[in-house]
Amino acid sequence: MLALEVFDGYVSWLRDNVPHAYENLAPPATPAELDALERHLGYHLPAEVRAVLAVHNGQKSTDTAEHTEYATPCLPTLSLLSTTLIRECWDRWNALRDTPDIEQLQDMGDVFPGAAGLVKPLYSSPGWIPLWSDPINADYIGLDLDPDVRGTTGQIINFGRDEERHFICAPNYTSLLQILLDEVHTGAWPATEMETELPDGSWADLPWFGAPDDHFFNALYGRFKAQTT
């Protein structure tokens, strides 16, 4: 499977260039864990997503909007979510869709030029499955299993609290992994440190992946914009 070949290339690069991130990769997800996730979501995951999770089920330690573990992200500026955290993040948004003001929130959703008719102009959808997460904010890169009329099931999009305007990150997960591998080979995403406030109020420089003032969302949007303008 091409996705596994590309992901293996990325993991090899990670081992050689960002060892703190490599050491934070989690063991494989079991078939039972993957099946349970699909039942909970009510969607079948693309084979390439299952295959990658069956190699590394996210990270050993992970930072998300709900969890602070002072972890080195396994992706440039982003956390690689496990089956458990995919479910937890999806549940948070599923609960939001049950709130009385959901219609007002849905009206906040929009798409960038070039994504009209491909991604639904919503704030949230049960068919949006988070795979990669911002370590601090509830913002995600993930599967779109509920595309608009001209979209493709399994396309990769941005969504979340501050990502209410959507674009196509990649046509599928394999393509997203190839973008990831291409990006790290540019040298733009080195092993770095980030000044972080600890629970006792002190500050420390902790291992990080990518420039502290940059974000992988920007790289993905830059590629989308270049293709649509």
Annotate each language-model stretch with its function.
Residues 139-166:
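Low-complexity, glycine/alanine/valine/leucine- and proline-rich hydrophobic stretches
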Residues 1-136, 192-196, 210-229:
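A surface-exposed partner-binding patch
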Residues 157-164, 208-213, 222:
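Secondary-structure transition/turn motif
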Residues 153-155, 185-190, 207-210:
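A short, hydrophobic/aromatic-rich structural module that often spans a beta strand
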Residues 163-187:
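Compact, glycine/acidic-enriched structural inserts
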Residues 55-56, 132-134, 144-146, 159, ...:
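Structured loops at beta-to-helix junctions and adjacent beta-edge loops in soluble globular domains
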Residues 30, 79-82, 154, 172, ...:
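Helix N-terminus capping/helix-initiation residues
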